[in-house]
Amino acid sequence: MNQGKIVQCIGAVVDVEFAREEMPKVYDALVLEGSELTLEVQQQLGDGVVRTIALGSSEGLRRGMMVTNTGDQIRVPVGTKTLGRIMDVLGTPIDEMGPIGAEQNRSIHQKAPAFDELSASTELLETGIKVIDLVCPFAKGGKVGLFGGAGVGKTVNMMELIRNIAIEHSGYSVFAGVGERTREGNDFYHEMKDSNVLDKVALVYGQMNEPPGNRLRVALTGLTMAEHFRDEGRDVLLFVDNIYRFTLAGTEVSALLGRMPSAVGYQPTLAEEMGRLQERITSTKSGSITSIQAVYVPADDLTDPSPATTFGHLDATVVLSRDIASLGIYPAVDPLDSTSRQLDPLVVGEEHYSTARAVQQTLQRYKELRDIIAILGMDELSPEDKLAVARARKIQRFLSQPFNVAEVFTGAPGKYVPLKETIKGFKGIVSGEYDHLPEQAFYMVGGIDEAVEKAKTLQ
């Protein structure tokens, strides 16, 4: 084992000097003598000095401390032994339930699958959430982004998706908590436990109180575990909450490594780092990874470099809107801004496609008329426009839905709505079958039959 000594510490970045002929390679893991702290080599500065990131707290480090080169990259446990466990960035269990005992370890730095190994799928993944299944359907083996500013419901949507898909899909899932609140990680663990799906989920946490090195690498740790399940021939779900914190950790590290910042202070390697992560999240001929990623949007600005870079990698984008949340409509998904490559008559069928487009056209017409209504009132509209507004308001309310994971807050039991029910309901509203019902009947219900029942109690 090669040994070196610390020559400089600046926050999470540590410079270590080795003998010139024993200089570690980039991404080698170094271990601090007499401590659990792992350092990952990022740059070779020459003359035997390497610049590393500390994957843990760098408190108490001082010059002259001895460091050992393991001669290998960071390796984490993979396989079924990781299911039901909570691990950190290094794959160390943090749930106080003893060692993982996995038979296999795998490096967190892997090459993306070769072009000829990839496979495309058009099979739909039903989520049971009306607005998502209708206007931005997910593909099995696809990549989905949940975009939203602070407090519009990304994590709640994510938890509902995990609950619905984990229960209905009955496959394995990996959840990577990247720089999010520890409380949410705890809530999520108990939610999985109560739903009896914990034995199918591997949890990897690097929360917001941890150093930037942990937050930068924890997404790769979760991805490595998911890749192993995929390579075994399984269909696996990978949830990342939140991909923006991965970028932000990269920004913190980049500045400490001495790189010049680019637009809005982001790292100059933003597109490359994101690309390297996203290209590994893909489906091959042996198995599939369906990935759902929450993306924080700074100051609700979708043109910010971080969310803008993420957009290009996704098959479906679910955009959460503060305006819709302020109306009390949850999930606050914007049906006009959200898109999916699967919304194609050849994939979803003509009925689904035409219903989704009719819903969007009606909502778009209402959006255009809103200014006129605000200035002149409803009476100035033509009869056709009045009808369009009435239907749009019903659609808007019918897009809301009570969630299972929010039941403890709202007291309303959650609803899972099958795709057939969703299409039937919206088709009926658009074609005018339910024009006689009051719009309140459509708010926070599951299928259309519930809305009809609710209308009877309102009359």
From Swiss-Prot:
Annotated transmembrane regions? none
Residues binding ATP, per UniProt: G148, G149, A150, G151, V152, G153, K154, T155
Which reaction is recorded as catalysed by this protein?
Answer: ATP + H2O + 4 H(+)(in) = ADP + phosphate + 5 H(+)(out)
What keyword terms does UniProt attach to this protein? Answer: ATP synthesis, ATP-binding, Cell inner membrane, Cell membrane, CF(1), Hydrogen ion transport, Ion transport, Membrane, Nucleotide-binding, Translocase, Transport
EC number assigned by the record: 7.1.2.2
Matching entries from CDD domains are given as: ATP-synt_F1_beta_C (cd18110), ATP-synt_F1_beta_N (cd18115), F1-ATPase_beta_CD (cd01133)
Q: Which GO terms describe its molecular function?
A: ATP binding; ATP hydrolysis activity; proton-transporting ATP synthase activity, rotational mechanism
The answer to keyword Transmembrane applying to this record is no
Which compartment or compartments is the protein found in? Cell inner membrane
Q: Which Pfam families match?
A: ATP-synt_ab, ATP-synt_ab_N, ATP-synt_VA_C
Membrane topology summary: Peripheral membrane protein
Q: Which Gene3D superfamilies match?
A: 2.40.10.170, Bovine Mitochondrial F1-atpase, Atp Synthase Beta Chain, Chain D, domain 3, P-loop containing nucleotide triphosphate hydrolases
Q: Which GO terms describe its cellular component?
A: plasma membrane; proton-transporting ATP synthase complex
Q: What family does this belong to?
A: Belongs to the ATPase alpha/beta chains family.
Q: What does this protein do?
A: Produces ATP from ADP in the presence of a proton gradient across the membrane. The catalytic sites are hosted primarily by the beta subunits.
Give the multimer and partner information.
F-type ATPases have 2 components, CF(1) - the catalytic core - and CF(0) - the membrane proton channel. CF(1) has five subunits: alpha(3), beta(3), gamma(1), delta(1), epsilon(1). CF(0) has three main subunits: a(1), b(2) and c(9-12). The alpha and beta chains form an alternating ring which encloses part of the gamma chain. CF(1) is attached to CF(0) by a central stalk formed by the gamma and epsilon chains, while a peripheral stalk is formed by the delta and b chains.
Q: Which HAMAP family match?
A: ATP_synth_beta_bact
Name of the molecule in the record: ATP synthase subunit beta 1
What is the source species?
A: Nitrosospira multiformis (strain ATCC 25196 / NCIMB 11849 / C 71)
